[in-house]
Every structure is written in structure tokens, then in C-alpha cells.
């Protein structure tokens, strides 16, 4: 009888153990590690395996390691520069080729008054950054990249100025200018950026008129006059939108030509010419005949300017 009771107790305990095992929660399937986490886990496992294969450290090694742990190296604690990409993942910071070229061209502008829009100016700019002068070989020999970079920077500076003026008006800290005065000041502000380089600007202008530079230079010009009209408050959606920008582009280019030949103090003749052209544009009607004549005059003026500048700079001479 006692044996039967004992055997029954064993069965009950075994059944309870089985029931406990069946009631244990089933672990959920863990998602696959992301590539970055997977690489980190693999590195940790590899490190553990290497530690297992190595002999145990001696007491002197343990003491030196303990001292090193007490006095961490500041350089080791400094994390490398990182940035966040479009996917939200952090990567180590690096400088792309475009960023390097941007830095070199920006530094080269300081040497344009001395060397002009040349490879020598680019080489000097590279050396000022601690780079080899051979970095100038990243660019062409005609200075096109340097000139286009300068125009792009000037347009960005102008946009910033116009944005700041708009903010002051919105905050009530400045009065809103009339359209003619706003455009005149905007064009003058942009042209004054050429003054430090005015001696070499005729050649830059002629280089921008070369066939392979016309698309980017025209894009920069149209973008600039569009910003001017935008901050002037233009909200036209009809044909006047194109007319106003074409007229302003013509005014800018013709005033630029006058400026390159102006010897008056502080380019007074240039600003007087600009004011008269802006006034004429504001008084001009919007008939089809006037629009056509304005467009034809603009094209003829630009073509004449290209021929004139080629003659001045000697680009039309055979070498």
C-alpha cells in the first residue's frame, strides 16, 4: 500500500512538471538584426572568441589594464564626426569631391584680382587651404568653373539681402519700397559685387558667352531676375510674368556693360544709367509690338556685347 502511494506521488509530481513546461511562454521570433547591428554583434562574438583563445593575463598585465581603465585617454573618448543620411542612419563624416571643389573655388576668389580667372588663382586657393597646387587640375583651363561659382555665390548673397529686407518690412521695422526703387536697389546691390573684380570682369563676361557656358550662365541670370521680381512683390501669372523678367535681364546686362567701361567716381554714371532704364521699363506699355521690339533689342544687345567683349579680350584672335 505504501509503495502504491509513493508511486502515485511520483506520477503527480511528474505530471505537474510537464504541465509547467507546457505553460512556459513561447519566445517570439526576433526580427533579423539590421546590417549595422549584425556587424556589431559579429565583432563582439569575434572578440570573445579571440579572448578565449588567448592565455589568461598575468598579474602585472591586470594591474596595468586597471590603471589604464582608471585614466581614460581623452582622444579615445572623442567620437569621430558623424552625419545623418537620408535613411536616418549615422555615418562617419567625410568630404565629397563637390565639397572640396567648392572650398577650393571659394578660396581662389581671393586671388582673382591678382591672377584673374585662371588656373593660377585656383592653384593659389588650393595652397591656401593646405592642399597641393595640383588640385587645380580638377578644373578646366578657361576659368569657367571659377566664374560660374562666383556668379552663384553673388546670387545667393543677393537673395539673402532681399530676404532680410522682406523680414524687416514684415516686422514693421522698414517701409516697403516702390517697385522701381526696389528693382534699382536690387540690381545695384548685385552689380556692386563685381567691383573687387571689375578689372578682370570683361574677360569673365566673354567667357560666360562661350557656347558651352551659355546654358548655365543664362540659368543663373534668369534665376536672379526671378528672385528680384519675387521679392518686389510680383504676382503676375500671364504673359507679363515673362515680359518683366526678360526686360529686367536686359537692363541688368546692359548696365553691366556700361559698368565695365565706367571710369566715374563710384560708378556714378552706371547708377544713373540704371535708374533711367528702370524708369523707362516702368513706363513701358505691354502691347505685343512693344514686347516684340524689347525682345529683339535684348537679343541684339547681347549679341553685340559678345562681339565687343571678344574684341576687347582678344578671344577672337587666332593663336
Swiss-Prot record:
Keywords: Acetylation, Lipid-binding, Mitochondrion, Transit peptide, Ubiquinone biosynthesis, Ubl conjugation. Transmembrane segments: none annotated. Pfam families: COQ9, COQ9_N. GO terms for biological process: ubiquinone biosynthetic process. InterPro entries: COQ9_C, COQ9_HTH, Ubiq_biosynth_COQ9. In response to mitochondrial stress, the precursor protein is ubiquitinated by the SIFI complex in the cytoplasm before mitochondrial import, leading to its degradation. Within the SIFI complex, UBR4 initiates ubiquitin chain that are further elongated or branched by KCMF1. Residues 1-45 form a transit peptide. Signal peptide: none annotated. The keyword Ubl conjugation applies. A motif (SIFI-degron) lies at residues 17-32. Its main location: mitochondrion. It is found in: Mitochondrion. The keyword ATP-binding does not apply. The modification N6-acetyllysine is found at residue 176. A 1,2-diacylglycero-3-phosphoethanolamine binds at residue 245. PANTHER family: UBIQUINONE BIOSYNTHESIS PROTEIN COQ9, MITOCHONDRIAL. NCBIfam families: diverge_rpsU. Homodimer. Heterodimer; two heterodimers of COQ7:COQ9 come together on the same side of the lipid pseudo-bilayer and form a curved tetramer with a hydrophobic surface suitable for membrane interaction. These two tetramers assemble into a soluble octamer with a pseudo-bilayer of lipids captured within. Interacts with COQ7; this interaction allows ubiquinone (CoQ) isoprene intermediates presentation to COQ7 and facilitates the COQ7-mediated hydroxylase step. Structurally similar to the bacterial FadR protein (fatty acid metabolism regulator protein). This is Ubiquinone biosynthesis protein COQ9, mitochondrial. The lineage of its organism: Eukaryota, Metazoa, Chordata, Craniata, Vertebrata.
Amino acid at each position: 500500500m505504501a509503495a502504491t502511494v509513493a508511486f502515485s506521488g511520483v506520477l503527480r509530481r511528474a505530471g505537474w512538471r510537464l504541465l509547467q513546461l507546457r505553460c512556459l511562454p513561447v519566445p517570439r521570433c526576433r526580427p533579423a538584426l539590421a546590417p549595422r547591428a549584425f556587424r556589431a554583434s559579429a565583432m563582439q562574438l569575434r572578440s570573445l572568441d579571440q579572448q578565449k583563445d588567448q592565455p589568461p593575463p598575468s598579474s602585472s598585465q591586470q594591474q596595468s589594464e586597471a590603471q589604464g581603465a582608471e585614466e581614460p585617454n581623452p582622444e579615445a573618448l572623442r567620437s569621430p564626426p558623424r552625419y545623418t543620411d537620408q535613411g536616418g542612419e549615422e555615418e562617419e563624416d567625410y568630404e565629397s569631391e563637390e565639397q572640396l571643389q567648392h572650398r577650393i573655388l571659394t578660396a581662389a576668389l581671393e586671388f582673382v584680382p591678382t591672377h584673374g580667372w585662371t588656373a593660377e588663382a585656383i592653384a593659389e586657393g588650393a595652397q591656401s587651404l593646405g592642399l597641393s597646387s595640383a588640385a587645380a587640375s580638377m578644373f578646366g583651363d578657361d576659368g569657367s568653373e571659377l566664374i560660374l561659382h562666383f556668379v552663384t555665390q553673388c546670387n545667393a548673397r543677393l537673395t539673402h539681402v532681399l530676404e532680410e529686407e522682406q523680414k524687416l518690412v514684415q516686422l514693421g521695422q522698414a517701409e516697403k519700397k516702390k517697385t522701381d526703387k526696389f528693382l534699382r536697389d536690387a540690381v545695384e546691390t548685385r552689380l556692386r559685387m563685381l567691383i573687387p573684380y571689375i578689372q578682370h570682369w570683361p574677360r569673365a563676361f566673354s567667357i560666360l558667352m562661350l557656347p558651352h557656358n551659355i546654358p548655365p550662365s543664362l540659368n543663373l541670370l534668369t534665376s536672379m531676375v526671378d528672385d528680384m521680381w519675387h521679392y518686389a512683390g510680383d504676382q503676375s501669372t500671364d504673359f507679363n510674368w515673362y515680359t518683366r523678367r526678360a526686360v529686367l535681364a536686359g537692363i541688368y546686362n546692359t548696365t553691366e556693360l556700361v559698368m565695365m567701361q565706367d571710369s566715374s567716381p563710384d560708378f556714378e554714371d552706371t547708377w544713373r544709367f540704371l535708374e533711367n532704364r528702370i524708369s523707362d521699363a516702368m513706363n513701358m506699355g505691354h502691347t505685343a509690338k512693344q514686347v516684340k521690339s524689347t525682345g529683339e533689342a535684348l537679343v541684339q544687345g547681347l549679341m553685340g556685347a559678345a562681339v565687343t567683349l571678344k574684341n576687347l579680350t582678344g578671344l577672337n584672335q587666332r593663336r
